[in-house]
UniProtKB/Swiss-Prot annotation:
This is Terpene synthase 18. Keywords: Lyase, Metal-binding. It comes from Heterostelium pallidum (Cellular slime mold). GO terms for biological process: terpene biosynthetic process. GO terms for molecular function: metal ion binding; terpene synthase activity. A motif (NDxxSxxxD/E motif) lies at residues 211-219. Belongs to the terpene synthase family. The keyword Metal-binding applies. Its EC number is 4.2.3.160. Gene3D superfamilies: Farnesyl Diphosphate Synthase.
Amino acid sequence: MLSLNEIKFPSHWNLVPNEPSYVDYVYREGLDLGVWRPDNQRDRMAHNNVVSLTRFFWPNVDFERLVMGGELMLWFFTFDDGLDAGIYDDQKSVDLVRRMEIVFMDGPEKVAFRLRSRCLEMCGKRRDTFNRFISSCVQWVDSIIPFNKVKDGGSPHIELYSFLRKINIGAYPCVTLTEVMLNHHLEPYIWSDPRWLKMNENIAIVVTLINDLVSYEKEVNDNAGVLNPLYFFQHQNNQNLPDSYRKMVNLIHQYVNDYLHLEEGFLRSMAPFHDALQHQEVHFMLDHLHYLITGSRMWSMQTPRYCSPTSPFIEMRPPSKSYL
Protein backbone atom coordinates (compact mmCIF):
# COMPACT_ATOMS: atom_id res chain seq x y z
CA MET A 1 0.00 0.00 0.00
CA LEU A 2 1.33 3.44 -0.96
CA SER A 3 0.93 6.62 1.08
CA LEU A 4 0.65 10.18 -0.19
CA ASN A 5 2.06 11.29 3.16
CA GLU A 6 5.48 10.17 1.97
CA ILE A 7 5.48 13.48 0.09
CA LYS A 8 6.81 16.09 2.51
CA PHE A 9 6.14 19.82 2.40
CA PRO A 10 7.13 22.59 4.84
CA SER A 11 4.75 22.70 7.81
CA HIS A 12 3.86 26.36 7.21
CA TRP A 13 2.30 25.29 3.90
CA ASN A 14 -0.48 23.50 5.81
CA LEU A 15 -3.98 24.93 5.54
CA VAL A 16 -7.51 24.79 6.90
CA PRO A 17 -10.04 24.88 4.01
CA ASN A 18 -12.29 27.92 3.65
CA GLU A 19 -16.01 27.79 4.38
CA PRO A 20 -18.15 26.12 1.64
CA SER A 21 -21.19 28.41 1.32
CA TYR A 22 -19.96 29.81 -2.03
CA VAL A 23 -20.44 26.35 -3.61
CA ASP A 24 -24.24 26.73 -3.70
CA TYR A 25 -23.96 30.29 -5.02
CA VAL A 26 -21.76 29.19 -7.94
CA TYR A 27 -24.06 26.20 -8.53
CA ARG A 28 -27.01 28.55 -9.05
CA GLU A 29 -24.87 30.51 -11.50
CA GLY A 30 -24.08 27.26 -13.31
CA LEU A 31 -27.79 26.49 -13.60
CA ASP A 32 -28.43 29.96 -14.99
CA LEU A 33 -25.64 29.51 -17.54
CA GLY A 34 -26.96 26.14 -18.64
CA VAL A 35 -23.83 24.31 -17.48
CA TRP A 36 -25.90 22.09 -15.16
CA ARG A 37 -29.34 20.54 -15.54
CA PRO A 38 -31.95 21.40 -12.89
CA ASP A 39 -32.64 18.70 -10.30
CA ASN A 40 -29.94 16.42 -11.68
CA GLN A 41 -28.10 14.70 -8.85
CA ARG A 42 -25.13 13.66 -10.98
CA ASP A 43 -24.62 17.25 -12.16
CA ARG A 44 -24.86 18.50 -8.59
CA MET A 45 -22.23 16.03 -7.42
CA ALA A 46 -19.93 16.93 -10.31
CA HIS A 47 -20.29 20.60 -9.43
CA ASN A 48 -19.57 20.05 -5.75
CA ASN A 49 -16.50 17.96 -6.52
CA VAL A 50 -14.93 20.45 -8.92
CA VAL A 51 -15.88 23.77 -7.33
CA SER A 52 -15.00 22.60 -3.82
CA LEU A 53 -11.33 22.76 -4.84
CA THR A 54 -11.54 26.54 -4.52
CA ARG A 55 -11.74 26.45 -0.72
CA PHE A 56 -8.42 24.58 -0.64
CA PHE A 57 -6.62 26.91 -3.06
CA TRP A 58 -7.86 30.10 -1.38
CA PRO A 59 -8.42 29.17 2.29
CA ASN A 60 -8.21 32.73 3.65
CA VAL A 61 -10.15 34.93 1.21
CA ASP A 62 -13.61 36.47 1.52
CA PHE A 63 -16.86 35.26 -0.07
CA GLU A 64 -16.56 37.43 -3.19
CA ARG A 65 -13.10 36.07 -3.97
CA LEU A 66 -14.21 32.50 -3.26
CA VAL A 67 -16.97 32.96 -5.83
CA MET A 68 -14.42 34.14 -8.38
CA GLY A 69 -12.30 31.07 -7.74
CA GLY A 70 -15.39 28.88 -8.00
CA GLU A 71 -16.33 30.47 -11.33
CA LEU A 72 -12.85 29.75 -12.65
CA MET A 73 -13.12 26.09 -11.62
CA LEU A 74 -16.58 25.89 -13.21
CA TRP A 75 -15.22 27.25 -16.46
CA PHE A 76 -12.26 24.86 -16.37
CA PHE A 77 -14.65 21.93 -15.97
CA THR A 78 -17.06 23.12 -18.66
CA PHE A 79 -14.34 23.50 -21.26
CA ASP A 80 -11.68 20.93 -20.37
CA ASP A 81 -13.77 17.85 -19.65
CA GLY A 82 -15.45 17.97 -23.06
CA LEU A 83 -12.14 18.08 -24.92
CA ASP A 84 -10.53 15.44 -22.70
CA ALA A 85 -13.49 13.10 -23.19
CA GLY A 86 -12.79 12.92 -26.93
CA ILE A 87 -16.39 13.62 -27.89
CA TYR A 88 -15.36 16.16 -30.58
CA ASP A 89 -13.45 15.55 -33.80
CA ASP A 90 -10.28 17.53 -34.50
CA GLN A 91 -11.93 20.38 -36.37
CA LYS A 92 -14.68 20.77 -33.78
CA SER A 93 -12.05 20.85 -31.03
CA VAL A 94 -10.07 23.57 -32.82
CA ASP A 95 -13.24 25.59 -33.39
CA LEU A 96 -14.12 25.30 -29.71
CA VAL A 97 -10.65 26.46 -28.66
CA ARG A 98 -10.88 29.50 -30.93
CA ARG A 99 -14.31 30.29 -29.57
CA MET A 100 -13.06 30.12 -25.97
CA GLU A 101 -10.12 32.38 -26.80
CA ILE A 102 -12.56 35.01 -28.04
CA VAL A 103 -14.78 34.52 -25.01
CA PHE A 104 -11.96 35.42 -22.66
CA MET A 105 -10.40 38.15 -24.77
CA ASP A 106 -13.67 39.90 -25.64
CA GLY A 107 -16.22 38.45 -23.19
CA PRO A 108 -19.23 37.98 -25.51
CA GLU A 109 -20.69 34.85 -23.86
CA LYS A 110 -22.13 34.30 -20.41
CA VAL A 111 -19.92 31.31 -19.67
CA ALA A 112 -16.99 33.63 -18.89
CA PHE A 113 -18.67 37.03 -18.81
CA ARG A 114 -19.37 37.13 -15.07
CA LEU A 115 -15.89 36.14 -14.00
CA ARG A 116 -14.32 38.45 -16.56
CA SER A 117 -16.50 41.35 -15.39
CA ARG A 118 -15.72 40.73 -11.71
CA CYS A 119 -12.00 40.69 -12.47
CA LEU A 120 -12.16 43.85 -14.55
CA GLU A 121 -14.01 45.67 -11.77
CA MET A 122 -11.65 44.43 -9.05
CA CYS A 123 -8.58 45.39 -11.08
CA GLY A 124 -9.78 48.93 -11.70
CA LYS A 125 -6.88 50.77 -13.31
CA ARG A 126 -4.60 47.74 -13.03
CA ARG A 127 -5.10 46.71 -16.63
CA ASP A 128 -1.72 44.96 -16.62
CA THR A 129 -3.04 42.61 -13.92
CA PHE A 130 -6.25 42.00 -15.82
CA ASN A 131 -4.32 41.33 -19.03
CA ARG A 132 -2.07 38.82 -17.27
CA PHE A 133 -5.10 36.93 -16.01
CA ILE A 134 -6.80 36.83 -19.42
CA SER A 135 -3.55 35.89 -21.16
CA SER A 136 -2.98 32.99 -18.76
CA CYS A 137 -6.50 31.70 -19.47
CA VAL A 138 -5.96 31.90 -23.23
CA GLN A 139 -2.60 30.18 -22.84
CA TRP A 140 -4.27 27.37 -20.90
CA VAL A 141 -6.98 26.99 -23.56
CA ASP A 142 -4.32 26.75 -26.27
CA SER A 143 -2.45 24.02 -24.37
CA ILE A 144 -5.22 21.43 -24.21
CA ILE A 145 -5.23 20.05 -27.77
CA PRO A 146 -1.41 19.87 -28.10
CA PHE A 147 -1.13 18.05 -24.79
CA ASN A 148 -3.85 15.58 -25.70
CA LYS A 149 -2.09 14.90 -29.01
CA VAL A 150 1.15 13.91 -27.28
CA LYS A 151 -0.30 10.48 -26.56
CA ASP A 152 -0.47 9.75 -30.30
CA GLY A 153 3.29 9.24 -30.18
CA GLY A 154 3.23 7.16 -27.02
CA SER A 155 4.40 8.17 -23.56
CA PRO A 156 6.77 11.19 -23.62
CA HIS A 157 10.00 11.72 -21.72
CA ILE A 158 9.31 13.24 -18.31
CA GLU A 159 11.08 16.51 -19.26
CA LEU A 160 8.88 17.01 -22.33
CA TYR A 161 5.84 15.98 -20.33
CA SER A 162 6.59 18.50 -17.57
CA PHE A 163 7.26 21.29 -20.06
CA LEU A 164 3.83 20.85 -21.66
CA ARG A 165 1.89 19.98 -18.54
CA LYS A 166 3.02 22.97 -16.46
CA ILE A 167 0.75 25.09 -18.67
CA ASN A 168 -1.95 22.49 -19.24
CA ILE A 169 -2.56 21.83 -15.52
CA GLY A 170 -4.19 25.28 -15.16
CA ALA A 171 -2.13 26.61 -12.23
CA TYR A 172 -1.17 29.88 -13.96
CA PRO A 173 -4.74 31.21 -14.21
CA CYS A 174 -5.15 30.48 -10.48
CA VAL A 175 -2.03 32.52 -9.69
CA THR A 176 -2.99 35.45 -11.91
CA LEU A 177 -6.51 35.40 -10.47
CA THR A 178 -4.91 35.68 -7.03
CA GLU A 179 -3.03 38.73 -8.28
CA VAL A 180 -6.40 40.18 -9.30
CA MET A 181 -7.59 39.66 -5.70
CA LEU A 182 -4.87 41.95 -4.29
CA ASN A 183 -5.57 45.49 -3.16
CA HIS A 184 -2.54 46.57 -5.22
CA HIS A 185 0.33 47.66 -3.05
CA LEU A 186 2.90 45.97 -5.28
CA GLU A 187 4.82 47.19 -8.30
CA PRO A 188 3.94 45.35 -11.54
CA TYR A 189 7.60 44.59 -12.37
CA ILE A 190 7.52 41.92 -9.64
CA TRP A 191 5.53 39.57 -11.88
CA SER A 192 8.22 39.59 -14.58
CA ASP A 193 10.99 38.72 -12.11
CA PRO A 194 12.63 35.54 -13.48
CA ARG A 195 12.63 34.04 -9.99
CA TRP A 196 8.89 34.55 -9.68
CA LEU A 197 8.27 33.03 -13.10
CA LYS A 198 10.44 30.01 -12.30
CA MET A 199 8.71 29.61 -8.92
CA ASN A 200 5.39 29.45 -10.76
CA GLU A 201 6.75 26.78 -13.10
CA ASN A 202 8.01 24.61 -10.24
CA ILE A 203 4.72 24.86 -8.38
CA ALA A 204 2.75 24.02 -11.54
CA ILE A 205 4.85 20.92 -12.15
CA VAL A 206 4.43 19.73 -8.55
CA VAL A 207 0.66 20.26 -8.80
CA THR A 208 0.79 18.24 -12.02
CA LEU A 209 2.66 15.35 -10.43
CA ILE A 210 0.30 15.25 -7.45
CA ASN A 211 -2.67 15.23 -9.81
CA ASP A 212 -1.08 12.39 -11.75
CA LEU A 213 -0.67 10.36 -8.57
CA VAL A 214 -4.23 10.77 -7.34
CA SER A 215 -5.76 10.27 -10.81
CA TYR A 216 -3.61 7.22 -11.58
CA GLU A 217 -6.27 4.55 -11.07
CA LYS A 218 -8.95 6.54 -12.90
CA GLU A 219 -6.71 7.23 -15.89
CA VAL A 220 -5.48 3.66 -16.17
CA ASN A 221 -9.08 2.41 -16.04
CA ASP A 222 -9.96 4.95 -18.76
CA ASN A 223 -7.04 3.77 -20.94
CA ALA A 224 -5.36 7.16 -20.47
CA GLY A 225 -2.32 5.99 -18.51
CA VAL A 226 0.03 6.75 -21.41
CA LEU A 227 0.13 10.38 -20.20
CA ASN A 228 0.50 9.57 -16.50
CA PRO A 229 4.11 9.40 -15.21
CA LEU A 230 3.26 6.90 -12.48
CA TYR A 231 2.09 4.61 -15.27
CA PHE A 232 4.66 5.33 -17.96
CA PHE A 233 7.62 5.20 -15.55
CA GLN A 234 6.75 1.55 -14.97
CA HIS A 235 6.89 0.81 -18.69
CA GLN A 236 9.76 3.08 -19.71
CA ASN A 237 12.03 1.95 -16.86
CA ASN A 238 10.74 -1.58 -16.34
CA GLN A 239 9.85 -0.71 -12.74
CA ASN A 240 7.09 -1.87 -10.44
CA LEU A 241 4.49 0.51 -9.02
CA PRO A 242 6.24 1.19 -5.66
CA ASP A 243 9.55 1.99 -7.38
CA SER A 244 7.82 4.29 -9.86
CA TYR A 245 6.08 6.03 -6.98
CA ARG A 246 9.39 6.56 -5.17
CA LYS A 247 10.78 8.08 -8.36
CA MET A 248 7.87 10.54 -8.45
CA VAL A 249 8.23 11.38 -4.75
CA ASN A 250 11.92 12.16 -5.29
CA LEU A 251 11.06 14.28 -8.31
CA ILE A 252 8.47 16.24 -6.31
CA HIS A 253 10.95 16.83 -3.48
CA GLN A 254 13.52 18.06 -5.99
CA TYR A 255 11.10 20.63 -7.42
CA VAL A 256 10.02 21.72 -3.92
CA ASN A 257 13.64 22.21 -2.82
CA ASP A 258 14.38 24.22 -5.97
CA TYR A 259 11.29 26.31 -5.29
CA LEU A 260 12.35 27.04 -1.70
CA HIS A 261 15.75 28.23 -2.92
CA LEU A 262 14.10 30.49 -5.50
CA GLU A 263 11.63 31.86 -2.96
CA GLU A 264 14.46 32.74 -0.61
CA GLY A 265 16.22 34.69 -3.37
CA PHE A 266 12.97 36.34 -4.44
CA LEU A 267 12.32 37.64 -0.92
CA ARG A 268 15.90 38.86 -0.57
CA SER A 269 15.56 40.80 -3.82
CA MET A 270 12.52 42.64 -2.44
CA ALA A 271 13.99 43.58 0.93
CA PRO A 272 13.31 45.87 2.58
CA PHE A 273 9.56 46.06 2.01
CA HIS A 274 8.18 49.58 1.66
CA ASP A 275 5.49 48.97 4.25
CA ALA A 276 3.44 46.30 6.04
CA LEU A 277 0.86 46.18 3.23
CA GLN A 278 3.47 45.29 0.64
CA HIS A 279 4.85 42.58 2.93
CA GLN A 280 1.33 41.23 3.44
CA GLU A 281 0.51 41.06 -0.27
CA VAL A 282 3.77 39.39 -1.25
CA HIS A 283 3.18 36.70 1.35
CA PHE A 284 -0.45 36.37 0.24
CA MET A 285 0.83 35.47 -3.22
CA LEU A 286 3.48 33.11 -1.86
CA ASP A 287 0.93 31.40 0.38
CA HIS A 288 -1.26 30.81 -2.66
CA LEU A 289 1.59 29.03 -4.43
CA HIS A 290 2.03 26.84 -1.35
CA TYR A 291 -1.70 26.13 -1.12
CA LEU A 292 -1.90 25.06 -4.77
CA ILE A 293 0.27 22.10 -3.76
CA THR A 294 -0.96 21.23 -0.29
CA GLY A 295 -4.56 22.04 -1.22
CA SER A 296 -4.40 19.73 -4.24
CA ARG A 297 -3.25 16.85 -2.09
CA MET A 298 -5.76 17.52 0.70
CA TRP A 299 -8.69 17.92 -1.72
CA SER A 300 -7.73 14.77 -3.62
CA MET A 301 -7.85 12.69 -0.44
CA GLN A 302 -11.56 13.39 -0.01
CA THR A 303 -13.12 13.91 -3.45
CA PRO A 304 -15.20 11.17 -5.11
CA ARG A 305 -13.64 12.32 -8.40
CA TYR A 306 -10.54 10.29 -7.52
CA CYS A 307 -11.17 8.35 -4.31
CA SER A 308 -11.83 4.66 -4.71
CA PRO A 309 -11.92 1.52 -2.55
CA THR A 310 -9.19 0.09 -4.80
CA SER A 311 -6.90 3.12 -4.97
CA PRO A 312 -3.20 2.28 -4.54
CA PHE A 313 -3.03 5.10 -1.95
CA ILE A 314 -4.26 4.31 1.52
CA GLU A 315 -5.49 7.87 2.14
CA MET A 316 -7.81 7.66 -0.86
CA ARG A 317 -9.77 4.57 0.07
CA PRO A 318 -11.36 5.03 3.48
CA PRO A 319 -13.59 2.00 4.17
CA SER A 320 -16.44 4.06 5.58
CA LYS A 321 -17.32 5.77 2.27
CA SER A 322 -18.91 4.65 -0.94
CA TYR A 323 -17.89 6.25 -4.24
CA LEU A 324 -19.51 6.79 -7.58
